[in-house]
């Protein structure tokens, strides 16, 4: 019984460190990934977001440059980072069945033509950022896009596992753009 009590105290002590050490949180997990700098630039305001786009399918986009909606989107993404448990390897295709939606954050102006699958490629201007956020149930894929081909972004991607309580925050983000 004494050993069980010691183990419980040890686990509680270790868990309390994760609450106070930033390296245990979702933000630190994201910052240590290949998209970390771009995430900070776009989600935490080091760069001005010019456009947010949301789609719940692959062919349509709801684009806005409204400052309030951009602020709402970046606030929700900051809340979502709190739900990041860990970075994961690219999951197998069966993990992508619960598609919830896809967001784009851009720090440059464009004619939005790349939202159409029939469009030509859009190369991201040097020094600019386009981040895509794909939500699949408890998986978040973030891509720092260098080139858009039709409706698909080509670039560096990171895959994150979200905790079970993340779904409400993701739904709030989606609701902002419906």
Tell me what each language-model feature is.
Residues 1-11:
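Bacterial N-terminal signal peptides that target proteins for export
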Residues 11-13, 34:
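Short, functionally important structural connectors and interaction interfaces within domains
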Residues 13-15, 58:
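A generic, residue-level signal for flexible/boundary positions that often mark functional hotspots
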Residues 15-16, 88:
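Repetitive helical segments and hydrophobic/amphipathic motifs
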Residues 19-23:
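C-terminal motif of bacterial Sec signal peptides marking the signal peptidase cleavage site
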Residues 25-178:
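Function-determining sites in protein domains
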């Amino acid at each position: 019984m004494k050993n069980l009590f010691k183990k419980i105290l040890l686990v509680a002590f270790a868990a309390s460190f994760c609450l106070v050490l930033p390296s245990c949180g979702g933000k630190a997990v994201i910052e240590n990934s290949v998209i970390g700098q771009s995430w900070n630039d776009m989600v935490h305001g080091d760069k001005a977001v010019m456009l947010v786009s949301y789609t719940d399918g692959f062919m349509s986009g709801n684009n806005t440059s409204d400052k309030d909606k951009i602020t709402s989107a970046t606030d929700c993404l900051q809340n979502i980072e709190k739900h990041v448990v860990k970075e994961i390897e690219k999951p197998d295709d069966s993990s992508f069945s619960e598609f919830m939606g896809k967001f784009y954050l851009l720090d440059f102006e464009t004619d939005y033509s790349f939202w159409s699958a029939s469009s030509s490629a859009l190369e991201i201007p040097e020094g600019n950022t386009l981040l895509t956020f794909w939500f699949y149930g408890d998986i978040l894929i973030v891509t720092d896009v260098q080139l858009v081909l039709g409706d698909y972004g080509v670039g560096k991607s990171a895959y994150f596992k979200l905790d079970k309580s993340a779904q409400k925050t993701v739904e709030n983000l989606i609701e902002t753009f419906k």
